[in-house]
A protein has these predicted regions:
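N-terminal Lys/Arg-rich, disordered targeting/topogenic segments
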Residues: 1-12
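Hydrophobic membrane-insertion alpha-helices, especially the h-region
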Residues: 14-31
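Membrane-interface motif at the C-terminal end of an N-terminal transmembrane signal
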Residues: 27-41
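Zn2+-dependent peptidoglycan hydrolase active-site motif and core
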Residues: 154-204, 229-234
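Acidic, glycine-rich catalytic/binding loops that coordinate metals and/or anionic ligands
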Residues: 182-186, 206, 212, 234-247
Length: 247
């Protein structure tokens, strides 16, 4: 028996109809998928933090290095006598212009200055020399000499953008995003800043976590490329390509 052949025109029509259906089905699937993503994004709330209400110091208690004995220099935070602990000294760029050689050890009139110079071992944009001053190098942060295990605090309300635990570079470090903060250059303008805390011994927060000003976020250490316990404290603006930024 001879099979019936499909006329060429009907055959062409069936192929065209099938292609049309396939294209439509593909487009429809894509449309549904995209709209589902948009709906999902609109349902998930955007993470925000409390508005700016001032700042706090990243370190609340630090040793009076000028009063420590040689043996006490290497003690952890919890082992240093409380009588030799105090508030973090003020950061004053002019202090770095005074050389250590001009400061007589044991002179009570220069005790605070000596302690400040020891505490801020590397100033902003300084180098690693003993008497480094600002803008003598390319260090984009302030190194704060503190014992291992010193509590570290968020300087302002923000969102943890990075909570890295690593053995190289910055070591264990945290980056916090601070939105709508007054600009350092013009307090009438608002911008986004990123504060970073590096070489930590312990990271106590997770990425995406909302933190408040003065909330403890970690413990200081000497992880990464650090050669002694300290806090690498850095602030970057929103134009930095990455955080913490390094040239």
């Amino acid at each position: 028996m001879r099979k019936n052949k499909i006329p060429p025109r009907k055959k062409w029509f069936k192929v065209t109809a099938w292609l049309t259906f396939t294209v439509f089905a593909t487009f429809f699937s894509y449309f549904v998928e995209q709209n589902a993503s948009l709906m999902k994004a609109s349902i998930i709330p955007t993470v925000t933090h409390e508005p700016f209400d001032g700042t706090a110091l990243p370190i609340q208690k630090a040793p009076d290095w000028s009063s420590l004995t040689t043996e006490e220099y290497n003690l952890s935070y919890s082992s240093i006598p409380s009588s030799k602990m105090g508030s973090l000294p003020s950061y004053n760029p002019s202090d770095f212009e005074t050389s250590f050689s001009s400061l007589k050890w044991g002179d009570p009139s220069t005790k605070d200055l000596r302690n400040a110079k020891i505490t801020y071992s590397v100033p902003y944009m300084g180098n690693y020399s003993l008497d480094s001053v600002e803008y003598s190098g390319s260090h984009l942060a302030v190194d704060i000499k503190i014992p291992k295990g010193t509590p570290v605090f968020a300087i302002g309300n923000g969102i943890v953008k990075k909570a890295s635990r690593q053995s190289t570079g910055f070591g264990n470090h945290i980056v916090i995003e601070h939105n709508n903060f007054p600009s350092i250059d013009n307090k009438d303008n608002f911008t986004t800043y990123y504060s970073s805390y590096s070489h930590l011994d312990s990271v106590l927060v997770e990425e995406g976590q909302v933190v408040r000003k003065g909330e403890q976020i970690g413990l200081s250490g000497e992880t990464g490329t650090a050669t002694t316990p300290h806090l690498h404290f850095q602030i970057d603006n929103d134009n930095a390509s990455w955080h913490p930024y390094w040239p």
